[in-house]
């Protein structure tokens, strides 16, 4: 249908970042609220220049037909999301565009009566779509940065089927850019925002936590119970160490790169002890502890029973490392990175990183070391 409409075969444009599903130039939803599934497709064509175009297709007489097309804001689609905030039941389309110069723009589209309208247009670094205010409808939070003004947060809430700007907030001036924005489910059932930002030094990341104060009806910075200076407490020195839901419980944990004091000895430069922290919890804040390989980009959770009682050293083989007893005499675990076809006596697979696999072998018996548990604690960073 799109080829017939354009008179040529277009180049489909895949988003470069996933918002939860597989990457696809097609997205489906009931855009106009008529109860039937519509489609949107992103493409570029020689006749219409370098910018991405978005076309809306409806089902007509058993076939797809293009009903509207609109030029996008840049040459690349970074992300695609949808939001159902209209009383009519229609769904709005959120598209993050990126230009070759690095500028990014978020467009919100509304489709009614076979007309695609751009109802919101904002520059952004990161955005998050979630019911932050507890209204029952998705809110839109946009982080942007401009030279001389630092990072700004804008909160848009859903009113009368539109996103309405309700707050602007200047963020910690020590951050120079936003590298990640995540919604995190708290113990109280409400959502917090976890922000990862580049620090002023340019060589480290740090984090901030934002929450919605229902009494003030505003987003503000959350004061962690156990940390008076969350910015400095969460500084880490690898771009791989971004916040994520490390244990799959809906809460996003912040990785804390920690020294070896009281935890054991670590003598391999590419490795680091990491504690994944939920600073919004009143009780158990450390959700996972283990070792991150910052060269190959993976994390391996270690059993709590080994914490403070081990040393981590280079292994006997290239790209391998070992977990030993604190005195170095007892070998508990060997971890190595190998080619896919390499096997070894006693080794089992932890996971894959690109075209390589990570294996482990348990040495002397330790009650807390079990293959299934170790494989379950393997995470690609």
Predicted regions and their residues:
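Membrane-interface alpha-helices
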Residues: 316-328
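A bilobed periplasmic-binding-protein/Venus flytrap-type ligand-binding module shared by bacterial periplasmic
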Residues: 361-362
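Beta-propeller-forming repeat regions
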Residues: 1-314, 321, 341-344, 348-353, ...
């Amino acid at each position: 249908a799109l080829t017939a409409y354009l008179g040529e075969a277009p180049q489909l444009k895949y988003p470069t970042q996933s918002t939860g599903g597989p990457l696809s130039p097609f997205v489906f939803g009931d855009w106009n609220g008529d109860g039937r599934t519509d489609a949107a497709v992103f493409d570029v064509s020689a006749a219409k220049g370098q910018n991405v175009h978005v076309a809306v297709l409806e089902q007509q007489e058993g076939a797809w037909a293009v009903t509207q097309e609109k030029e996008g804001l840049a040459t690349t689609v970074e992300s695609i999301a949808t939001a159902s905030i209209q009383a009519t039941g229609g769904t709005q389309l959120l598209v993050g565009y990126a230009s070759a110069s690095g500028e990014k723009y978020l467009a919100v589209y509304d489709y009614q009566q076979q007309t695609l309208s751009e109802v919101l247009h904002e520059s952004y670094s990161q955005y998050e779509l979630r019911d932050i205010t507890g209204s029952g409808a998705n809110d839109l939070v946009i982080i942007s940065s401009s030279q001389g003004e630092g990072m700004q947060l804008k909160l848009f809430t859903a009113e009368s089927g539109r996103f309405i700007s309700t707050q602007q907030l200047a963020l910690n001036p020590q951050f120079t850019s936003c590298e990640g924005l995540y919604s995190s489910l708290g113990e109280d059932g409400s959502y917090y925002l976890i922000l990862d930002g580049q620090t002023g030094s340019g060589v480290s990341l740090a984090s901030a936590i934002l929450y919605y104060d229902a009494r003030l009806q505003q987003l503000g910075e959350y004061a962690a119970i156990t940390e008076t200076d969350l910015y400095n407490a969460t500084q880490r020195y690898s771009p791989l160490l971004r916040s994520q839901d490390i244990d799959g419980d809906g809460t996003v944990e912040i990785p804390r790169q920690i020294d070896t004091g009281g935890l054991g000895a670590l003598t391999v430069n590419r490795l680091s002890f990491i504690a994944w922290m939920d600073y919004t919890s009143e009780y158990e804040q450390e959700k996972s502890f283990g070792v991150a390989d910052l060269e190959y980009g993976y994390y391996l959770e270690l059993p709590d029973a080994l914490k403070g009682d081990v040393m981590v050293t280079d292994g006997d083989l290239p790209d391998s490392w070992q977990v030993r007893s604190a005195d170095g005499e007892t070998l508990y675990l060997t971890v190595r990175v190998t080619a896919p076809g390499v096997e070894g006596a006693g080794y089992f697979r932890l996971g894959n990183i690109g075209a390589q696999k990570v294996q482990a072998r348990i040495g002397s018996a330790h009650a807390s070391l079990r293959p299934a548990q170790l494989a379950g604690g393997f995470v690609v960073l």
